[in-house]
């Protein structure tokens, strides 16, 4: 059996410039997510310019500290524990990771258990494993370093513009996806121009195809 590299299947590699396609706007506004879902990288791939919102208020039950992978028993959510924010309006950039519960070890073991039998896991594991042995004080820094790694592996140009302050009024022609890519939002709204394509998944025969995973 000849396997396709899932990273190339899900988001085709590009060379030097961001590519504008269906659903992409002149400038895209995103939030920082933990191992963001495929839809997120689809937007990054197609957007000519990306601004990363770092002054948005941290929100629970979002992808800011949670990713979803395909486990043996179905979708598995992995959440990075955070310290209690000093106020209900604490900015994402100021959210601190709580070092309790041995979460790094648990997350890495879950990733290995879920993907160790996939054709390309050994090829990529050395890139990702160090993130689960290093201490990051801030959630945003952890998320962004992982995003930079995934962008490099996918061949997506890495530079983004970090917002100097919260963008309350979105400029004309911009696409605001800060709250669009969210576990509570319907995937097939078409707002981001992302439509899932089938690719190899380890547990597909048991669970069916799981869309928009974080891997």
What does each model-identified segment do?
Residues 3-4, 14-215:
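Residues lining hydrophobic/aromatic ligand-binding pockets adjacent to catalytic sites
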Residues 9-11:
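N-terminal amphipathic/hydrophobic targeting modules at extreme N-termini
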């Amino acid at each position: 059996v000849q396997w396709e590299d899932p990273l190339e299947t899900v988001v085709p590699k590009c060379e030097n410039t961001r590519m504008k396609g269906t659903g992409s706007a002149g400038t895209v506004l995103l939030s920082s997510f933990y191992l963001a879902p495929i839809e997120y990288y689809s937007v990054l791939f197609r957007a000519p310019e990306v601004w990363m919102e770092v002054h948005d208020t941290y929100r629970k039950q979002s992808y800011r500290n949670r990713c979803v992978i395909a486990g043996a028993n179905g979708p598995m959510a992995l959440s990075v524990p955070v310290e209690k924010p000093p106020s209900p309006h604490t900015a994402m950039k100021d959210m601190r990771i709580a070092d309790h519960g041995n979460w790094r070890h648990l997350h890495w073991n879950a990733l290995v258990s879920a993907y160790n039998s996939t054709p390309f896991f050994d090829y990529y594991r050395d890139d990702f494993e160090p993130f689960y042995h290093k201490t990051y004080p801030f959630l945003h820094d952890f998320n962004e370093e992982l995003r930079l790694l995934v962008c490099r592996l996918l061949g997506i140009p890495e530079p983004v513009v970090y917002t100097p302050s919260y963008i309350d009024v979105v400029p004309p022609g911009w696409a605001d996806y800060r709250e669009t890519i969210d576990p509570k939002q319907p995937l097939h709204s078409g707002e981001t121009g992302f439509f899932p394509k089938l690719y190899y998944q380890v547990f597909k025969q048991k669970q069916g195809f799981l869309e928009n995973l974080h891997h």
